[in-house]
Amino acid sequence: MNKLMKKETFNKLIPVICTLGILTFISGCGTASESVTSTGMVKVGSMNVETDPGYTDISPRESVIENFVSDEGLCRIDKYESYYDVTLDYENGTPSEVGEAYARTLLKAVPDYEEIFEPYLYENIRGLFNGREINYDALEKRIMTLEASIREEYRNEIEGFAYAMAAGAEGYCEDGKLSYIEAITMQMIPDALRPTACSALTVGGSITETGERISLRNLEWYLGSSEQMTQIHSVAHLIKGDKTITSIGVLGLLDMITAINDNGVFIGILDVGTVNEMPFVYEGKKCYTYEIRYALETFDNARDAAEFLNKESGDFTWCHNLLVTDETDAFCCENPTSEAVEAGRAIAVIRTCDSELMEGITWDTPDALCIVNTYATAGNQDGFTGQLGEINRFVKYNNYVKEAGIFSVADMKGIMAHEIVDQYEVPNVHNSGTVHTVIVDYATGDIHVAFTAGRCADDIPEYILVGNYGET
């Protein structure tokens, strides 16, 4: 049976496999019931993509439409059809000067940038206050306290960016412009306001056609009421000495959401909540998205980066997972806050392909590591029980990896082409919150990205080549 026939057969069986897998999963994680019935279940039909995606290991490059360069040459922005490619030069300017150059060049490239981003920022702020009246004094105190914790060079860059962007405007005011404090706030959305959901998969050389690792990271984020984030995708190259970081994210943001350095250390953030929730603490805390940036600038291998970030986890504002890979190793940093650890709810641990998983979780493929929005190591906080979204995605990833067997880049692309995206009946891996999917092929160094355009991701996403981590 060829791979295409196997895929079609597997797709027809997915609803049955996932249902059986989830029922088994639930019975392991929670209190077993005497029987399982179909009472209350609603038949929703097939949610699978029946069309073969026709992927290959090669992704096309887009052509530059227009480019913009700052007066002093510290920032260059190339406009492509799907994204903006940004180059920031820290060799020939101070961090503050680079930040200023970025803001000014950005406004040339996207004159209505403030009209795009400011409404999105306030949607996140309103989400933070969850319907309550917004206390702007409290918000500003939170932001300025966290900003003060950021390493000086990054802080200077943020402030340079905010100074140039604001052009003298101050205070929180929803007016279609970005003031100084708003431009500071936008740089700390994951640390101060909070992201949503993500997932990741990495497969080692023993199960790839080339014998080299392939890593995937799917970012799920709030797109904005008008899908603002899909209008300003970016790939930013931060050049400092002999080190270059490539950050796949949002135009204008300086934090690290999905990023890789020129040694191939690849890091992606994934949110993790605390069971029954806990009070948010920001005093004495650090911004983990900027500590990731420091790790990428400092370490040339995934192990050292993972150990550094896991050791610091108690100092961060939110519980989270981190995908950390290089060509030889793969890790999930299960990073709880110190408050969660002290309450006995979680432990800081680095999960590998060989780690013992918590009771009830099944993963069938050695040399493959899957991450969703909960911890999975034995003895850590259980975010699976009662959370069908997490259970469903983990079970599906497990089945998809078994189906692929030996992976090519095309197979990894296909992980995100199994399910109909624009549906809300069944939790899916590739869903309507997807902002981008990034695949790193360690055999070539190529970085393949599918950027969401419009209201939601395509059922069969189109990947483009945005660069090579070994090229500067």
Language-model features: where?
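Internal mixed beta-strand/loop scaffold within catalytic domains of large alpha/beta enzymes
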Residues: 183-286, 290-291, 448-449
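Bacterial N-terminal signal peptides that target proteins for export
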Residues: 3-17
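Short intrinsically disordered, low-complexity coil segments enriched in acidic
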Residues: 2-3, 437
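C-terminus-biased signal that marks the final domain/tail of proteins
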Residues: 29, 36-197, 296-472
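Bacterial N-terminal signal peptides
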Residues: 16-25
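Generic signal for short, ordered secondary-structure residues
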Residues: 8, 136-140, 284
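A compositionally biased, intrinsically disordered/low-complexity signal enriched
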Residues: 4, 31-36, 213
